[in-house]
Curated annotation (Swiss-Prot):
The keyword Ribosomal protein applies. One of its GO terms (molecular function) is structural constituent of ribosome. Part of the 30S ribosomal subunit. This is Small ribosomal subunit protein uS8c. GO terms for biological process: translation. It comes from the Eukaryota. The gene is rps8.
């Protein structure tokens, strides 16, 4: 049985955010690097650096947290895996869902690479819906 690397990075980031950890280390692959670059560009994480250990590459992510002393801690990241190995979900560019009226993003795997829902709509291409982030 294969590993679902996208679900692994989503779970790692979600667990670190719930545990209020500032740094997360995930395995580096082409698809994880592309997803992390989208998260960085959209402002969901603060920093990314590539780390090598025993001939294996890892991405070290610095998460963005809201600290408010008056209220209890709130998670800033909500991630949900949509298309999975057992059930692939595809969409054309006209039917790509809008998350929270455009406040969240949808990450898609298209024929032109991994991109956000806004980029896919502008280019007029659809693809496999990987995850929602809000």
């Amino acid at each position: 049985m294969g590993r679902d690397t996208i679900a692994e990075i989503i779970t790692s980031i979600r667990n670190a955010d719930m545990d209020r950890k500032r740094v997360v280390r995930i395995a580096s692959t082409n698809i994880t690097e592309n997803i992390v670059q989208i998260l960085l560009r959209e402002g969901f994480i603060e920093n990314v650096r590539k780390h090598r250990e025993n001939n294996k590459y890892f991405l070290v992510l610095t998460l963005r947290h809201r600290r408010n002393r008056k209220r209890p801690y709130r998670n800033i990241l909500n991630l949900k895996r949509i298309s999975r190995p057992g059930l692939r979900i595809y969409s054309n560019y006209q039917r790509i869902p809008r998350i929270l009226g455009g406040m969240g993003i949808v990450i898609l795997s298209t024929s032109r690479g991994i991109m956000t829902d806004r980029e896919a709509r502008l280019e007029g291409i659809g693809g496999e819906i990987l995850c929602y982030i809000w």
